[in-house]
Amino acid sequence: MAGFVILYHRKVVSADIPALDPAVRRRIKAAIEAKLLFHPEEHAKPLAYTTARLWALRVGDWRVVFALRNRELWILTIGHRSEVYEHLSARAVPPA
C-alpha cells in the first residue's frame, strides 16, 4: 500500500524548521515519518472550530498541523503548542 506524499508549506521550510532546536527537529522528523506516512488519522486529532479540516500531531509540547488532500499530506505549520495555532490563518494548502 502506498503512503501519503508529505509536502511542506514554504514557510515551514523557511521559518518553522530552522527555528527548532536540533534535538526537537529530529524528534519531529521521526514522528512525521513514523506516524503520518500511512495512517495519519490514527495518530492525530482533528482541529475543532475550523472549516479547513485540519489535523494536529502532538510531539511532546510541539505540534505539527497538517491537511489531507487526496494522497497528499500538507504540513502547514510546526511549532510550540502555545503559539502554533496563531499561524494557521496565513497558511493554506496551495491550490491543486
Regions found by a protein language model. Name each.
Residues 1-31:
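Arg/Lys-rich, positively charged N-terminal/basic patches that mediate binding to nucleic acids
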Residues 3, 26, 41, 59-62, ...:
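Enriched for short, Lys/Arg-rich terminal
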Residues 11, 52, 83:
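Residue-level recognition of oxygen-bearing side chains
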Residues 14, 38, 83:
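Active-site micro-motifs of SAM-dependent methyltransferase domains
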Residues 33-58:
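A short, surface-exposed loop/turn module that caps and links secondary-structure elements
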